[in-house]
Amino acid sequence: DWLTIDICDEGDDDRLFRLIADADVLWHVLQPATAEVIAAAPKLRLIQKIGVGVNTINLEAARARNITVCNMPGTNSQAVAEATVMLMLSALRRGMAFHDATRRGDGWCMDPSVFDQIGEILGRTVGLIGYGEVARRTAPVVAALGARVLYTATAPKDDAVGEWRDLKSLLVESDVISLH
């Protein structure tokens, strides 16, 4: 009886405001923890973001009430890095065009206008804009596949996989650009 966990679906504002009135902790996923939500929670002591960013939490309202805000940095970096590489490969290999053709029953078209545009990451230059945790995990994977890696960040990183460039140079030199 010392712990009660209530679940509220995203977008169910009526239930949210009913529950938040007696909540000590808000486990926050996507629905914004606005100043209005925080004001409706007189007992609230902690907002725990189940994820990385806190951009959906009104930090000023939480700070004004001395409510602690926590997040989970790095928890999805590997998954996002893997998805980044998958999307690069899919774009280069024209994955969606072949997927759509297969779903229509057309099979794999050997039409040169489609087939000749298929590329590999080998020999390409991949530019990473930003060099946080996701880019740090993406860089060695694309390098292992044979890509040249460039990155831009506020300053060159000693432990980076790849070569630092200013943004303009990175955009000019890169075949594939990934925002991080």
Predicted regions and their residues:
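Short, charged, surface-exposed secondary-structure boundary motifs
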Residues: 56-60, 79-83, 159-162
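Short, acidic/turn-prone active-site loops that include or flank metal/cofactor-
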Residues: 51-54, 74-77, 155, 170
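Short gly/ser/thr-rich secondary-structure transition/capping motifs
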Residues: 5-11, 27-29, 104-113, 158-164
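An N-terminal-biased, well-structured beta-alpha scaffold segment characteristic
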Residues: 1-69, 172, 179
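Short loop/edge segments at beta-strand edges and connector loops
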Residues: 7-9, 73, 153, 166
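Rossmann-like dinucleotide/phosphate-binding beta-alpha-beta segment
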Residues: 112-180
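Positions that flank functional sites
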Residues: 13, 35, 77-78, 157
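Phosphate-binding beta-alpha-beta segment of Rossmann-like dinucleotide-binding domains, i.e.
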Residues: 65-67, 73-125
